[in-house]
Swiss-Prot record:
Entry keyword Iron: no
Gene3D superfamilies: 3.30.70.260, P-loop containing nucleotide triphosphate hydrolases
Name used for this protein in its record: Methionine import ATP-binding protein MetN
Annotated CDD domains: ABC_MetN_methionine_transporter
Organism listed in the record: Ligilactobacillus salivarius (strain UCC118) (Lactobacillus salivarius)
Gene Ontology MF, one: ATP binding
Amino acid sequence: MTDIITLENIDVTFKQGKQIVNAVKNVNLNVEKGDIFGVVGYSGAGKSTLVRTINLLQKPTSGTVKVNGTLLFADNKQQISNKELQKQRRSIGMIFQHFNLLNETTVVDNVAFALRHSSLSDKEIEEKALNLLKLVGLEDKAKFYPIQLSGGEQQRVAIARALANDPEILISDESTSALDPRTTNQILDLLKELNAKLGLTIVLITHEMDAVKRIANKIAIMEHGVIIEKGKLRDVYLRPKEELSRQFVGGSLAAIETLKAFNLGNLSPDQKLFQLVFSAANVTKSIILELYKELGLDVSMLYGNIEVLESEPVGTMFILAKGEPDKLDKVADYLKKENVEVTRIDERGIWND
């Protein structure tokens, strides 16, 4: 896939009184066309500031911004005219925690408002607005006013409005944080559907790992203006390297706490700890029994969990294997033949390879 967003060595600094605040520090990020890319971090991590550099709503202090093959910012200055920048911004839709709808205007006119500067006729604008409402499941609410809608329905209107200019990129900035869990999932599922149906690239800013886990395929975790970890969702979720990443990935943190509770101490030469990751196709296999039968190892399961990542169930198991050292060395090769991912870990739950 081709990169649709490229951020290189991005710095954003602000002056507060006599102090210089480094909101974003030397960040590099590549988003491929069709990605749903989650940017996760606590409040103040710099994630919204970073993502707003994509359309230069926040101009970097330094670095390079390229969107869809066009160089927007480099050498400490904007590289295109303001007119061209406005055109680029229309190719990037945005939705927020607050819906920002016009309360005195009908739902269909709220969507049509985004097309007021287009070359379409009034009739064409109304037709397009109605089609967008149908796309987000609100065709029956076209003549309603925002106050008559639920929070989830208002966010659907905001999504329809954000899609009015046929953007290739949609930035979702904490768009579900004000919604209840059920409505949150409905909005996330809608974004996933739009990604598949329209080929829409989505950048999902959130402090909620569950939102990323539900729909994203890639993730970056930010802290104090720095990306501390990034990669494919599955890789980061199942094997987080940084402490903050483990906090966001509750399953990994729970596994590590469980290992600590076993108080394993230093492992002897005839003991090894492994993390096993397996797909739904392998769930029915008795891995512990197979290791005993094939390699003569005594295996104890210390922790197990199943998560749904990218709509697929993925199982994780931490095991302690005991036996002859040469047999322990064969665990990884044997299980890989069974399509089970194997990573050796130490007694603290730190990934060694």
